[in-house]
Amino acid sequence: CAQGLSLHLGKRQIIDNVSVALRGGEMTALIGPNGAGKSTLLRLLTGYLTPDSGTRHLAGKPLEAWSPEALSRRRAVMLQRTALQADWTVETVIAMGRSPWGATADPAVLAAVMAVTGCDGLAGRRYPGLSGGEQQRVQLARCLAQLWRDGAPQGWLFLDEPTSALDLYYQQHLL
């Protein structure tokens, strides 16, 4: 997936010659102390940041060669902090994951991802009024909706601190 990634921010070396191999069907976790660069590495791997050096590939193709539309159909990203303040319903936020953005979401897909993430009980509620853990589950459902094909998510799911606001029940049952 990536070889020799390096990134400087100002004079500070954030990522130094990191290589990562990710395989389909596997779950990989990055573990380290706060400030170690895990979130930055995730942003490099997903194309949100451009490295100073190194190469990145998704499904054998250089990340830079993917169009934004094609990339959004193959990988979904849940960032650590989501700054969504829009007064939308839970269903609207989840449907935002469909590609292209604004495409009509299949009601069966919405129902499936809402059930998988425990968001079915949040139907009709407004996103800003949700707790942090509920918002986190909605964001996970949005990512799953983005990748949902043929009854299951198909593609690469990149999650940054996906359980940080979840209670113990959802921490154990979602991932």
What are the residue ranges of the model-derived segments?
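ABC ATPase NBD coupling module
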Residues: P62-A76
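Conserved ABC transporter NBD signature motif
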Residues: L22, G54-P62
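Helix-to-loop junction immediately C-terminal to a conserved catalytic motif
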Residues: T46
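Conserved ABC ATPase "signature" region
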Residues: P107-L122
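Conserved ABC ATPase signature
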Residues: R126-L130, E134-Q135
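Catalytic Walker B motif of ABC-type/P-loop ATPase nucleotide-binding domains
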Residues: A152-E161
